[in-house]
Regions:
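Acidic catalytic loop of the alpha/beta-hydrolase fold
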Residues: 136-140, 213-215
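Primarily recognizes the serine-hydrolase "nucleophile elbow" in alpha/beta-hydrolase
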Residues: 71-127, 138
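Catalytic active-site module of serine/aspartate enzymes centered on a nucleophile-bearing elbow/loop
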Residues: 222-237
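Alpha-helical scaffolding within the catalytic cores
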Residues: 7-12, 112-122, 185-194
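Acidic, glycine-rich loop-and-strand cores that form catalytic or ligand-binding grooves
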Residues: 148-186
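Short beta-strand/loop motif that positions the catalytic acidic residue
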Residues: 131-133
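Serine-hydrolase catalytic machinery in alpha/beta-hydrolase-like enzymes
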Residues: 1-81, 91-94, 98, 217-219
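Short, proline-enriched alpha-helix->beta-strand connector loops that line the catalytic pocket
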Residues: 124-129, 199-203
């Protein structure tokens, strides 16, 4: 993928102008160990069936990018958010864990947590999270992915249980209806939310019933616009 690919999927420029926030679409740092490809390097141990041990990581790149933006345009370091789709969503979970000291909140579309990210996640502050996932996504399976007895992707439930526990949220979710404004897209949306006792931090999950490996609002479900919903929630923090 590339920055232009993500821009085509989720063009947030008008939203950034109207809401007055700085918007950045970075390209992944070229991986010297993998033919200079620019896919986000999420895990480095080779634990996934399609990866080999690789010391290259884009975490340091994003770490330095945040510092650069602070120096160049004086971004508010207390309000830095990351969002991503598919592999970029896995990388976003990784940022929320491994760069938690610099990431305020995250939004992830069409991905659950990698098992390695889940096992090594270190959260230093309550972290608002928004997830959007179709229950018929056969690339980022809603129930997780296990291959030859090894768990590679956590289920959606396990992913949310992690953030519920580490954000000290109440375990019971609130279910809200989402209007089915497009009756021809073959899907509907349910919104699940969890809050802390003082309602200072939240977790939101948009479950797309009948949804695939999509970015709702651009393709697939058309009842919500993924990036608008993510900003709506994360901008509260």
């Amino acid at each position: 993928g590339s920055a232009n690919d993500q821009l085509a999927i989720a063009d947030m420029r008008d939203l950034a102008d109207s809401e007055n926030f700085i918007l950045v679409y970075p390209d992944a740092f070229p991986d010297p160990n993998s033919g200079q490809e620019t896919n986000w390097q999420v895990v480095t141990s080779g634990d996934l069936p399609f990866t080999l041990p690789n010391p290259h990581s884009d975490i340091l790149f994003i770490d330095q990018l945040i510092d650069h933006l602070h120096l160049e345009v004086n971004i508010d370091l207390n309000r830095v958010y990351a969002l991503g789709y598919s592999n970029g969503g896995g990388f976003t979970f990784d940022l929320g864990c491994r760069l938690n000291n610099k990431i305020t909140g995250i939004g992830v579309v069409a991905r659950t947590m990698y098992a390695e990210t889940y096992d090594n996640c270190i959260v230093t502050h309550p972290t608002p999270v928004v997830t959007i996932l179709g229950d018929e996504d056969y690339i980022s399976n809603y129930d997780g992915i296990t291959y030859e007895g090894t768990l590679y992707y956590q289920s959606s439930d396990a992913t949310h249980e992690y953030w519920i526990a580490n954000n000290n949220l109440l375990p019971t979710s609130n279910l809200s209806s989402v209007p089915n404004i497009n009756t021809t897209d073959g899907s509907t949306v349910e919104l699940y939310s969890w809050s802390s006792e003082d309602e200072c931090i939240d977790l939101y999950h948009y479950k797309v019933i009948g949804g695939g490996h999509d970015w709702p609002g651009t393709f697939g479900n058309m009842d919500i616009v993924s990036h608008e919903k993510i900003w709506e929630h994360l901008s509260e923090y």
